[in-house]
Structures are given as structure tokens and as C-alpha cells.
Amino acid sequence: MTLWMRLLPLLTLLVLWEPNPAQAFVNQHLCGSHLVEALYLVCGERGFFYTPKSRRGVEDPQVAQLELGGGPGADDLQTLALEVAQQKRGIVDQCCTSICSLYQLENYCN
């Protein structure tokens, strides 16, 4: 009984000290390696997708045509691309420039 009485304050302290899982990750700014580590943590074995703008332009011929100003209906495509670019936010805009949550990070998992 005396052992239990000695351990009770310690157990109470441990229970109170343990962070609540919902509060363990508050919305925060994540940039660079911290962003990558958070993605690994959230996505786990599923992994995540990442396509830098410089590589995306090389791999996607339509984007390359838009940047060079060529191709059929280039003016219409350029206008559409600008509208989409203004609406679409990347992970850096969401999590580094602004703050993001675990749920927003999960959108980038495979």
C-alpha cells in the first residue's frame, strides 16, 4: 500500500504532463527540411508527391509551350494558366508563407 501511495503522485504527474494528441501539433509555419519532415510524419509509408516548378516545366510540354508563348491558342491557354495559378496554392504557400494543419499536409500524401 505504501508503494502505491508513493507512485500515485508520479502517475498523476505523468498523466497531466502527456500532451493531448490533438494539441501535439498545432497549426504552424513549416519551411524547408521541417516541411519535409512533417510530410514524412503525416504520410508515412504512403509517401508524398513533390514536383518543383523548374522540373515541371521541363517535363510538361504544354507548360513549356505556354512559357515560350507557342502552340495553338497560346493566348487562351496563357490566360487560363494565369487564372489557375492565381487560384491554386502550393504547399509552400500553404505551410511556409501561411500556417497549415495536419489535415492540409495530408492533401499532399500519395
From Swiss-Prot:
SMART domains for this protein: IlGF (SM00078)
Gene3D superfamilies from the UniProt entry: Insulin-like (1.10.100.10)
Removed propeptide positions: 57-87
Entry's Gene Ontology cellular component terms: extracellular space
UniProt subcellular location: Secreted
Gene Ontology biological process terms in this record: cellular response to oxygen-containing compound; glucose homeostasis; glucose metabolic process; positive regulation of protein secretion
Taxonomic superkingdom: Eukaryota
Stated family: Belongs to the insulin family.
Function, as annotated: Insulin decreases blood glucose concentration. It increases cell permeability to monosaccharides, amino acids and fatty acids. It accelerates glycolysis, the pentose phosphate cycle, and glycogen synthesis in liver.
Assembly with partners or alone: Heterodimer of a B chain and an A chain linked by two disulfide bonds.
Name this polypeptide is given: Insulin
Species of the source: Cricetulus longicaudatus (Long-tailed dwarf hamster)
Taxonomic placement: Eukaryota, Metazoa, Chordata, Craniata, Vertebrata
